[in-house]
Protein backbone atom coordinates (compact mmCIF):
# COMPACT_ATOMS: atom_id res chain seq x y z
CA UNK A 1 0.00 0.00 0.00
CA UNK A 2 1.22 3.41 -0.91
CA UNK A 3 0.79 6.62 0.97
CA UNK A 4 -2.04 7.68 -1.37
CA UNK A 5 -4.28 4.80 -0.29
CA UNK A 6 -7.11 5.38 2.16
CA UNK A 7 -6.36 4.62 5.75
CA UNK A 8 -8.65 2.16 7.49
CA UNK A 9 -8.56 1.84 11.24
CA UNK A 10 -9.52 -1.36 12.97
CA UNK A 11 -10.63 -1.14 16.55
CA UNK A 12 -10.93 -4.24 18.68
CA UNK A 13 -12.83 -4.17 21.93
CA UNK A 14 -11.61 -5.43 25.25
CA UNK A 15 -13.63 -8.64 24.79
CA UNK A 16 -13.94 -9.41 21.03
CA UNK A 17 -15.12 -13.02 21.52
CA UNK A 18 -17.69 -12.05 24.15
CA UNK A 19 -16.27 -14.46 26.69
CA UNK A 20 -17.25 -12.21 29.59
CA UNK A 21 -20.93 -12.62 28.76
CA UNK A 22 -20.67 -16.40 28.20
CA UNK A 23 -18.79 -16.94 31.47
CA UNK A 24 -21.15 -14.71 33.47
CA UNK A 25 -23.20 -16.96 35.77
CA UNK A 26 -25.32 -14.14 37.23
CA UNK A 27 -27.46 -13.51 34.13
CA UNK A 28 -31.10 -14.56 33.97
CA UNK A 29 -30.80 -17.33 31.35
CA UNK A 30 -28.00 -19.14 33.17
CA UNK A 31 -29.88 -19.12 36.49
CA UNK A 32 -33.15 -20.14 34.82
CA UNK A 33 -31.56 -23.22 33.20
CA UNK A 34 -29.85 -24.21 36.44
CA UNK A 35 -33.26 -24.34 38.13
CA UNK A 36 -34.33 -27.03 35.63
CA UNK A 37 -31.25 -29.16 36.32
CA UNK A 38 -28.88 -27.88 33.67
CA UNK A 39 -25.21 -27.50 34.54
CA UNK A 40 -22.28 -25.84 32.73
CA UNK A 41 -20.81 -28.24 30.17
CA UNK A 42 -24.12 -29.98 29.42
CA UNK A 43 -25.70 -29.64 25.98
CA UNK A 44 -29.08 -28.31 24.88
CA UNK A 45 -31.22 -30.31 22.47
CA UNK A 46 -33.86 -33.01 22.06
CA UNK A 47 -31.45 -35.86 22.69
CA UNK A 48 -28.25 -35.70 24.78
CA UNK A 49 -26.25 -37.30 21.94
CA UNK A 50 -27.14 -34.60 19.38
CA UNK A 51 -27.24 -31.65 21.77
CA UNK A 52 -25.17 -28.51 21.29
CA UNK A 53 -22.50 -27.94 23.94
CA UNK A 54 -21.04 -24.80 22.36
CA UNK A 55 -22.47 -21.43 21.42
CA UNK A 56 -24.55 -21.00 18.28
CA UNK A 57 -22.35 -19.90 15.37
CA UNK A 58 -23.21 -18.49 11.94
CA UNK A 59 -22.54 -20.81 8.98
CA UNK A 60 -22.36 -19.56 5.39
CA UNK A 61 -24.64 -21.31 2.88
CA UNK A 62 -22.55 -21.51 -0.32
CA UNK A 63 -24.69 -23.99 -2.31
CA UNK A 64 -28.10 -24.10 -4.01
CA UNK A 65 -29.39 -27.01 -1.94
CA UNK A 66 -32.52 -26.45 0.13
CA UNK A 67 -32.53 -25.95 3.87
CA UNK A 68 -32.08 -29.19 5.78
CA UNK A 69 -30.77 -31.18 2.78
CA UNK A 70 -27.38 -31.80 4.37
CA UNK A 71 -28.97 -33.05 7.57
CA UNK A 72 -31.19 -35.39 5.56
CA UNK A 73 -28.19 -36.82 3.74
CA UNK A 74 -26.53 -37.68 7.02
CA UNK A 75 -29.51 -39.83 8.07
CA UNK A 76 -28.67 -43.10 6.30
CA UNK A 77 -31.37 -45.74 5.92
CA UNK A 78 -28.91 -48.44 4.80
CA UNK A 79 -25.39 -48.78 3.48
CA UNK A 80 -26.45 -47.67 -0.03
CA UNK A 81 -28.52 -44.67 1.02
CA UNK A 82 -26.05 -41.81 1.02
CA UNK A 83 -26.50 -38.89 -1.35
CA UNK A 84 -23.23 -37.10 -0.67
CA UNK A 85 -21.45 -38.51 -3.77
CA UNK A 86 -22.90 -38.63 -7.30
CA UNK A 87 -21.03 -41.80 -8.40
CA UNK A 88 -21.58 -43.84 -5.26
CA UNK A 89 -23.54 -46.59 -7.07
CA UNK A 90 -20.55 -47.29 -9.36
CA UNK A 91 -18.25 -47.46 -6.38
CA UNK A 92 -20.61 -49.89 -4.62
CA UNK A 93 -20.65 -52.16 -7.68
CA UNK A 94 -16.85 -52.23 -7.77
CA UNK A 95 -16.80 -53.22 -4.11
CA UNK A 96 -19.42 -55.89 -4.85
CA UNK A 97 -17.25 -57.40 -7.58
CA UNK A 98 -14.31 -57.54 -5.21
CA UNK A 99 -16.41 -59.12 -2.45
CA UNK A 100 -18.38 -61.43 -4.78
CA UNK A 101 -21.80 -59.74 -4.10
CA UNK A 102 -22.32 -57.98 -7.42
CA UNK A 103 -25.81 -59.40 -8.04
CA UNK A 104 -27.22 -58.31 -4.66
CA UNK A 105 -25.77 -54.83 -4.93
CA UNK A 106 -27.02 -54.34 -8.50
CA UNK A 107 -30.55 -55.44 -7.52
CA UNK A 108 -30.58 -53.05 -4.55
CA UNK A 109 -29.38 -50.15 -6.71
CA UNK A 110 -32.01 -50.89 -9.37
CA UNK A 111 -34.80 -50.87 -6.77
CA UNK A 112 -33.51 -47.57 -5.41
CA UNK A 113 -33.55 -46.02 -8.89
CA UNK A 114 -37.11 -47.19 -9.52
CA UNK A 115 -38.21 -45.83 -6.15
CA UNK A 116 -36.65 -42.45 -6.92
CA UNK A 117 -38.51 -42.33 -10.24
CA UNK A 118 -41.82 -43.22 -8.52
CA UNK A 119 -41.25 -40.76 -5.66
CA UNK A 120 -40.16 -38.02 -8.05
CA UNK A 121 -42.06 -34.94 -9.12
CA UNK A 122 -45.28 -36.81 -9.95
CA UNK A 123 -44.96 -39.40 -7.20
CA UNK A 124 -47.95 -40.11 -4.94
CA UNK A 125 -47.59 -41.01 -1.27
CA UNK A 126 -50.57 -42.60 0.44
CA UNK A 127 -51.03 -41.53 4.05
CA UNK A 128 -53.57 -43.25 6.29
CA UNK A 129 -55.96 -40.87 7.94
CA UNK A 130 -56.83 -40.92 11.63
CA UNK A 131 -60.52 -41.32 10.75
CA UNK A 132 -59.96 -44.97 9.72
CA UNK A 133 -58.36 -45.93 13.04
CA UNK A 134 -61.62 -47.36 14.42
CA UNK A 135 -62.41 -49.44 11.30
CA UNK A 136 -58.87 -50.74 10.70
CA UNK A 137 -57.83 -54.11 12.17
CA UNK A 138 -54.04 -54.15 12.71
CA UNK A 139 -53.95 -57.97 13.14
CA UNK A 140 -55.68 -58.94 9.87
CA UNK A 141 -54.74 -55.69 8.08
CA UNK A 142 -58.32 -55.34 6.80
CA UNK A 143 -61.32 -53.10 7.37
CA UNK A 144 -63.78 -54.30 10.00
CA UNK A 145 -67.35 -55.15 8.92
CA UNK A 146 -70.18 -54.55 11.41
CA UNK A 147 -73.52 -56.41 11.36
CA UNK A 148 -76.72 -54.77 10.12
CA UNK A 149 -78.42 -55.14 13.52
CA UNK A 150 -75.81 -53.06 15.22
CA UNK A 151 -76.11 -50.49 12.48
CA UNK A 152 -79.88 -50.35 12.84
CA UNK A 153 -79.63 -49.99 16.61
CA UNK A 154 -77.14 -47.24 16.19
CA UNK A 155 -79.30 -45.56 13.58
CA UNK A 156 -82.33 -45.79 15.91
CA UNK A 157 -80.38 -44.37 18.82
CA UNK A 158 -79.00 -41.66 16.62
CA UNK A 159 -82.49 -40.77 15.34
CA UNK A 160 -83.84 -40.55 18.91
CA UNK A 161 -80.93 -38.40 19.94
CA UNK A 162 -81.50 -36.21 16.92
CA UNK A 163 -85.22 -35.84 17.77
CA UNK A 164 -84.36 -34.84 21.33
CA UNK A 165 -81.81 -32.40 20.05
CA UNK A 166 -84.35 -30.95 17.60
CA UNK A 167 -86.91 -30.44 20.39
CA UNK A 168 -84.34 -28.77 22.59
CA UNK A 169 -83.28 -26.56 19.71
CA UNK A 170 -86.91 -25.56 19.01
CA UNK A 171 -87.53 -24.73 22.67
CA UNK A 172 -84.37 -22.70 22.84
CA UNK A 173 -85.32 -20.90 19.61
CA UNK A 174 -88.76 -20.02 21.02
CA UNK A 175 -87.22 -18.67 24.21
CA UNK A 176 -84.75 -16.64 22.22
CA UNK A 177 -87.57 -15.28 20.03
CA UNK A 178 -89.59 -14.23 23.10
CA UNK A 179 -86.58 -12.58 24.66
CA UNK A 180 -85.90 -10.78 21.42
CA UNK A 181 -89.50 -9.48 21.28
CA UNK A 182 -89.35 -8.27 24.89
CA UNK A 183 -86.07 -6.57 24.18
CA UNK A 184 -87.59 -4.80 21.16
CA UNK A 185 -90.62 -3.63 23.19
CA UNK A 186 -88.37 -2.28 25.91
CA UNK A 187 -86.34 -0.42 23.32
CA UNK A 188 -89.48 1.13 21.83
CA UNK A 189 -90.69 2.27 25.26
CA UNK A 190 -87.33 3.80 26.01
CA UNK A 191 -87.37 5.65 22.70
CA UNK A 192 -90.88 7.03 23.38
CA UNK A 193 -89.89 8.17 26.86
CA UNK A 194 -86.82 9.88 25.49
CA UNK A 195 -88.86 11.67 22.81
CA UNK A 196 -91.42 12.91 25.36
CA UNK A 197 -88.67 14.10 27.65
CA UNK A 198 -87.04 16.00 24.78
CA UNK A 199 -90.37 17.62 23.84
CA UNK A 200 -90.97 18.71 27.44
CA UNK A 201 -87.51 20.23 27.60
CA UNK A 202 -88.06 22.10 24.32
CA UNK A 203 -91.36 23.57 25.58
CA UNK A 204 -89.71 24.73 28.81
CA UNK A 205 -86.91 26.39 26.85
CA UNK A 206 -89.42 28.12 24.56
CA UNK A 207 -91.41 29.51 27.53
CA UNK A 208 -88.23 30.75 29.17
CA UNK A 209 -87.21 32.53 25.95
CA UNK A 210 -90.62 34.22 25.67
CA UNK A 211 -90.45 35.44 29.27
CA UNK A 212 -86.96 36.81 28.69
CA UNK A 213 -88.10 38.62 25.53
CA UNK A 214 -91.03 40.24 27.37
CA UNK A 215 -88.74 41.38 30.19
CA UNK A 216 -86.29 42.92 27.74
CA UNK A 217 -89.12 44.77 25.97
CA UNK A 218 -90.39 46.23 29.26
CA UNK A 219 -86.93 47.36 30.29
CA UNK A 220 -86.42 49.06 26.91
CA UNK A 221 -89.73 50.93 27.23
CA UNK A 222 -88.95 52.17 30.74
CA UNK A 223 -85.48 53.31 29.67
CA UNK A 224 -86.96 55.30 26.75
CA UNK A 225 -89.48 57.03 29.04
CA UNK A 226 -86.77 58.00 31.51
CA UNK A 227 -84.58 59.40 28.75
CA UNK A 228 -87.47 61.57 27.41
CA UNK A 229 -88.21 62.97 30.88
CA UNK A 230 -84.57 63.87 31.46
CA UNK A 231 -84.39 65.56 28.05
CA UNK A 232 -87.38 67.78 28.92
CA UNK A 233 -85.76 68.87 32.19
CA UNK A 234 -82.46 69.98 30.52
CA UNK A 235 -82.30 73.88 30.20
CA UNK A 236 -81.75 75.63 26.89
CA UNK A 237 -78.02 76.12 26.56
CA UNK A 238 -78.47 78.16 23.38
CA UNK A 239 -80.62 80.82 25.03
CA UNK A 240 -78.15 81.42 27.85
CA UNK A 241 -75.27 81.71 25.37
CA UNK A 242 -77.13 84.29 23.29
CA UNK A 243 -78.06 86.34 26.36
CA UNK A 244 -74.43 86.52 27.44
CA UNK A 245 -73.33 87.52 23.94
CA UNK A 246 -75.99 90.19 23.73
CA UNK A 247 -74.76 91.70 26.99
CA UNK A 248 -71.19 91.75 25.70
CA UNK A 249 -72.29 93.42 22.45
CA UNK A 250 -74.19 96.11 24.37
CA UNK A 251 -71.17 96.87 26.49
CA UNK A 252 -68.97 97.13 23.41
CA UNK A 253 -71.39 99.51 21.70
CA UNK A 254 -71.59 101.68 24.80
CA UNK A 255 -67.82 101.89 24.92
CA UNK A 256 -67.57 102.86 21.25
CA UNK A 257 -70.25 105.53 21.63
CA UNK A 258 -68.46 107.07 24.61
CA UNK A 259 -65.53 109.31 23.54
CA UNK A 260 -63.85 109.23 26.90
CA UNK A 261 -63.82 105.49 26.92
CA UNK A 262 -62.27 105.46 23.43
CA UNK A 263 -59.55 107.86 24.48
CA UNK A 264 -58.72 105.63 27.42
CA UNK A 265 -58.57 102.61 25.15
CA UNK A 266 -56.26 104.30 22.61
CA UNK A 267 -54.35 106.16 25.38
CA UNK A 268 -55.07 109.60 23.93
CA UNK A 269 -54.81 112.64 26.15
CA UNK A 270 -56.35 116.09 25.50
CA UNK A 271 -53.30 118.04 26.69
Curated annotation (Swiss-Prot):
Annotated region Disordered: where? 147-239
**One Pfam assignment:** G-patch
Residue span, G-patch domain: 25-72
Question: For this UniProt entry, what's an example GO CC term?
Answer: nucleolus
Q: What GO MF terms are annotated? A: enzyme activator activity; nucleic acid binding; telomerase inhibitor activity
Q: Which residues carry this modification: Phosphoserine?
A: 230
User: What SMART domains has UniProt attached to this entry?
Assistant: G_patch (SM00443)
| Sequence ranges of Basic and acidic residues compositional bias | 204-221
Q: Where is the composition biased (Acidic residues)?
A: 157-168
The biological processes this protein is annotated with in GO are: box C/D sno(s)RNA 3'-end processing; maturation of SSU-rRNA; negative regulation of telomere maintenance via telomerase
Q: Which domain of life is it from?
A: Eukaryota
Write out the biased-composition intervals (Basic residues). Answer: 175-203
Q: Which InterPro entries does the protein's record reference?
A: G_patch_dom, PINX1
Location, primary (coarse class) = nucleus
Family per similarity comment: Belongs to the PINX1 family.
Per the entry, what this protein does is: Involved in rRNA-processing at A0, A1 and A2 sites through its action in U18 and U24 snoRNA 3'-end final trimming. Negative regulator of telomerase through competition for binding to EST2 with TLC1.
The UniProt record's further free-text remark is:
Present with 3850 molecules/cell in log phase SD medium.
Query: Subunit structure of this entry?
Result: Interacts with EST2.
Q: Which PANTHER family match?
A: G PATCH DOMAIN CONTAINING PROTEIN, PROTEIN PXR1
Name the UniProt record assigns to this protein: Protein PXR1
Q: Which organism is it from?
A: Saccharomyces cerevisiae (strain ATCC 204508 / S288c) (Baker's yeast)
